Amino acid sequence: MSSRTGASLLLILFFFQICSVSALTNGLDASALNALKSEWTTPPDGWEGSDPCGTNWVGITCQNDRVVSISLGNLDLEGKLPADISFLSELRILDLSYNPKLSGPLPPNIGNLGKLRNLILVGCSFSGQIPESIGTLKELIYLSLNLNKFSGTIPPSIGLLSKLYWFDIADNQIEGELPVSNGTSAPGLDMLLQTKHFHFGKNKLSGNIPKELFSSNMSLIHVLFDGNQFTGEIPETLSLVKTLTVLRLDRNKLIGDIPSYLNNLTNLNELYLANNRFTGTLPNLTSLTSLYTLDVSNNTLDFSPIPSWISSLPSLSTLRMEGIQLNGPIPISFFSPPQLQTVILKRNSIVESLDFGTDVSSQLEFVDLQYNEITDYKPSANKVLQVILANNPVCLEAGNGPSYCSAIQHNTSFSTLPTNCSPCEPGMEASPTCRCAYPFMGTLYFRSPSFSGLFNSTNFSILQKAIADFFKKFNYPVDSVGVRNIRENPTDHQLLIDLLVFPLGRESFNQTGMSLVGFAFSNQTYKPPPIFGPYIFKADLYKQFSDVEVSSKSSNKSILIGAVVGVVVLLLLLTIAGIYALRQKKRAERATGQNNPFAKWDTSKSSIDAPQLMGAKAFTFEELKKCTDNFSEANDVGGGGYGKVYRGILPNGQLIAIKRAQQGSLQGGLEFKTEIELLSRVHHKNVVRLLGFCFDRNEQMLVYEYISNGSLKDSLSGKSGIRLDWTRRLKIALGSGKGLAYLHELADPPIIHRDIKSNNILLDENLTAKVADFGLSKLVGDPEKTHVTTQVKGTMGYLDPEYYMTNQLTEKSDVYGFGVVLLELLTGRSPIERGKYVVREVKTKMNKSRSLYDLQELLDTTIIASSGNLKGFEKYVDLALRCVEEEGVNRPSMGEVVKEIENIMQLAGLNPNSDSATSSRTYEDAIKGSGDPYGSESFQYSGNFPASKLEPQ
């Protein structure tokens, strides 16, 4: 092989090495996105390769190597949302809107997306119950699940989303009552004090609207409860929400009087109460000076004249009072409010003459008085407007000749698109600038516009200009926009407008451009003029995506370009090789400091590199080698996943336990330093104490006090030979509870153990319980309190049931594990034994009306032998079962657990403040005859310090 060929091959190999180590996407993120790609029948075009951040996958936004945004609206995606989505732990935005072929339930572990701010699934076909785990998305601001097929009830846990701004579940099949908190543990929607939007319309929600739902502390501006099955009266507490601007309670089964306390909502712009079962008379609402729209149609109100106070509403634009048994003549000043545009009074008993007089609003366009008793009509001399008097006596006498005797005919021909452009090819549309293109199209649904007339084209021209100006201001790839086909839904009076958005500089959008435009609407980034009110945008399927624009007109040009690119790549590789060599040199220099943070530590001097220890000593390798007789087999007393545990004797005669990390468990130097600093701060008589460490000769060792009587598991199983009567079990429960409460509440920073079990509770020579195996893994972000959690992900039988949904372990997870330990102390059984789960066995067997709750056959024989002195037994069982409640919010804190055990001990005639349990004459025999207390299952170290966020396995 020639030297030139060899050099070329080396260069190629080097290039592939660079590529292999320089992927720009975090491994778990890449795996999650590839799972999406595999799950979807029609993944987005351009999702090629295995490095989404590096190859710029459509709709994917990254920061560094982490995926922070997925925006894939209106891409005709088909399939389900796989559980792998939960691995995108840095994701802030998930927008899959307007993909109607996306179906199935949302994965329960969607709650693992702890940094998610925007969850936008509008216009898909997702179904099933909204996952309870959504309540764990503490950063969530925007939750849009409308226009899907969700069923079931609203999860109460959504009340925990303290930052939620937008909550939209409209147009689904959600049923049941609105959840409110119970004031103690159960959350509810009344806790959403920062939320501005409750959009719950067009579902199957039922029951009374809870009075507890509303308070003066809320920030709501839109409450849209229309099209449900709510019953009862409007709660008075609603009037406390002074920020409300839109209230839609129409199309329900509400009863009682329309309350006068609605006058307190002085910022209200739109009030919809139509199609309910209200009775009584319409109250005076003259305090609502900002009211644009009032709709009280189709209620069984008492016969009454047209209220004169209507003319005192200065902002009123649309008035609907259809079918509410109005009678008598129309007051002469009725049409005088200066902003009044539309009046609908049909299906009443209004009599005499329709006379607009001279004091009529200059804005008035449309008056509908069909099906009344009008006998005469005097048109306004100075105003052209549309009046409908069909099915009134005046029309029966005049016949069908006058135009006002014809039923309404809506004009939907208005369009801002030009009609004088040259014809376009089939499928294309002419833009306002007469360019033929494939526009991105859809329908704007305005849920409560403050006008109802379809005749004033000025409003729609304003809308068209506002949308175009928005896209121009923020540099969207948009040439122009147009609106057309304006119509009103007669059922709910929503205003529907077709929108066309034309691409800039090309015939069609690419997927990125179209997603940007769609996101502006799905995320409500675009805000329409206020008169249009809240809206949703339902996009049409867009398939005319432009391909990547590559010039291929000349093969010679292609060859030339290829040659130039080849030379550039070669030079680039040579440059990279040089840079790589320099960086490797510097990296090697840095590695010394990172891998050995104690390298510059002079024990005789003060140094910033010295670990800040509290009572822990730095041992040399030679010191520990000597005290373990060269780590002899005789001193090998067990171990776990971290490595082996050796017994040693210090020169002063003190017994120590040395945990020696095996190669696969070694941490980074800085991580090890951080860990020993934190472990050295833990000082409590019920927690195994760190005496020191060794970071020498590429070894990492932790030195602990030696606990002679092994684990609680050994004693319960009979392995240790120690007899545990009821008194001793209570003292062990109290001691281990105090140790765990210390870790939660007094350690600095607080520590979440994450693997509480009987193997990790050790007993000293006095049977004092000591919590072990709380090796640290990472700080958990909490603005109020910083916790440290352990690497261990828990043990079957002790594992918090909520973990399976959230993949998160908390202080309440430790409480659950401790509750299982309490039941172990009671039964002497392992958590799972012969396929039976001790928690379920106790719950099933228990009968509170009988002695000892009828649990005798489950109790440990040692307890049965002392059954005559089981004072506090029932309270102990109650406490254990509270600790193993399915939901963490229903479990006590460890501080509360300790207080209850102290009370139980007092009931048993014991002093909860005594320092130790009773001694045992079997201690020496146990130590000699049962093997070492640090057996293979005991005291398993969990101290691997992950460099990045801990992910579920």
Curated annotation (Swiss-Prot):
InterPro entries: Kinase-like_dom_sf (IPR011009), Leu-rich_rpt (IPR001611), LRR_dom_sf (IPR032675), LRR_N_plant-typ (IPR013210), Prot_kinase_dom (IPR000719), Protein_kinase_ATP_BS (IPR017441), Ser/Thr_kinase_AS (IPR008271). Disulfide bonds join 421-424, 434-436. Residues 1-23 form the signal peptide. Activated by autophosphorylation on serine and threonine residues in response to extracellular hydrogen peroxide. One of its GO terms (cellular component) is plasma membrane. Keywords: ATP-binding, Cell membrane, Disulfide bond, Glycoprotein, Kinase, Leucine-rich repeat, Membrane, Nucleotide-binding, Phosphoprotein, Receptor, Repeat, Serine/threonine-protein kinase, Signal, Transferase, Transmembrane, Transmembrane helix. Autophosphorylated at Ser-606, Ser-607, Thr-786, Thr-789, Thr-790 and Ser-942 in response to extracellular hydrogen peroxide. LRR repeats lie at residues 64-88, 89-113, 115-137, 138-162, 164-187, 192-216, 218-241, 242-265, 266-290, 292-311, 313-337, 339-361, 362-384. Widely expressed. Residues 631-905 form the Protein kinase domain. It comes from the Eukaryota. Disruption phenotype: No visible phenotype under normal growth conditions, but mutant seedlings exhibit reduced accumulation of intracellular calcium in response to extracellular hydrogen peroxide. It is a single-pass type I membrane protein. It catalyses: L-seryl-[protein] + ATP = O-phospho-L-seryl-[protein] + ADP + H(+); L-threonyl-[protein] + ATP = O-phospho-L-threonyl-[protein] + ADP + H(+). Residues 580-953 are cytoplasmic. Residues 912-953 are annotated as: Disordered. Its main location: membrane. The active site is at residue 755. ATP binds at residues 637-645, 659. Glycans are attached at residues 182, 217, 264, 284, 298, 411, 456, 459, 510, 523. The chain crosses the membrane at residues 559-579. Residues 24-558 are extracellular. Leucine-rich repeat receptor protein kinase that acts as sensor of extracellular hydrogen peroxide. Required for intracellular calcium influx in response to extracellular hydrogen peroxide. Mediates hydrogen peroxide-induced activation of calcium channels in guard cells and is required for stomatal closure. This is Leucine-rich repeat receptor protein kinase HPCA1.
